[in-house]
Design a protein with these regions (language model features):
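Nucleotide phosphate-binding/pyrophosphate-handling subdomain across enzymes
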Residues: 1-55
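Glycine/aspartate-rich loop-and-adjacent alpha/beta segment that forms the canonical ThDP
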Residues: 111-131
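Cofactor-binding loop segments of dinucleotide-utilizing enzymes, especially the Rossmann-like FAD-
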Residues: 34-38, 60-61, 111
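Active-site catalytic pocket residues across diverse enzymes, especially alpha/beta-hydrolases
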Residues: 19, 23, 76, 100, ...
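C-terminal helical cap/extension that packs against the catalytic core
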Residues: 1, 46-105
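Short hydrophobic/aromatic-enriched beta-strand-loop microsegments
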Residues: 29-31, 55-58, 126-131
């Protein structure tokens, strides 16, 4: 699991450039989770990140600035073959951890504010599943 702010195009490109150093044989599938504020360049961020995966899970960060997951998903349909809508970081993490296989890579990005939310959701899931 990689959790990165990547809340602007430069950050997204840096993340993609870093991911390219991970040999593809080291992971079976790459899952992307994106929660972003409405005032960010989310279309460009999502387009850049599509170099890593064809699957995107969209969620709304908490607070008034958070872009609704359905709006994000609608925008991202052109870049990803599979776009999933989840209510928040916790449900996005729950979804991906229930559907990902051992050896899959999971990357969460889009807002610095979601880092703690994602970390908390993972910790809760691990406790609930005795991981």
């Amino acid at each position: 699991l990689i959790v990165d702010g990547a809340h602007n195009p430069a950050g997204a490109q840096a993340l993609v450039d870093t991911i390219k150093y991970i040999p593809k044989e080291n992971y079976a599938k790459c899952w992307l989770l994106m929660g972003v504020f409405a005032d960010k360049e989310y279309k460009k961020i999502g387009q850049i990140m599509s170099d890593c995966s064809d699957t995107l899970i969209c969620f709304k960060p908490s607070g008034d600035r958070g872009l609704k997951a359905d709006k994000l998903a609608e925008t991202m349909q052109q870049y990803y073959s599979k776009v999933i809508i989840e209510e928040n970081a916790a449900t996005a993490i729950k979804y991906v951890l229930e559907h990902a296989s051992d050896g899959d890579m999971i990357i969460s990005f889009g807002s610095l504010s979601t880092i703690k939310m994602v970390e908390d959701a993972v910790a809760f899931w691990e406790v609930a599943h005795n991981v």
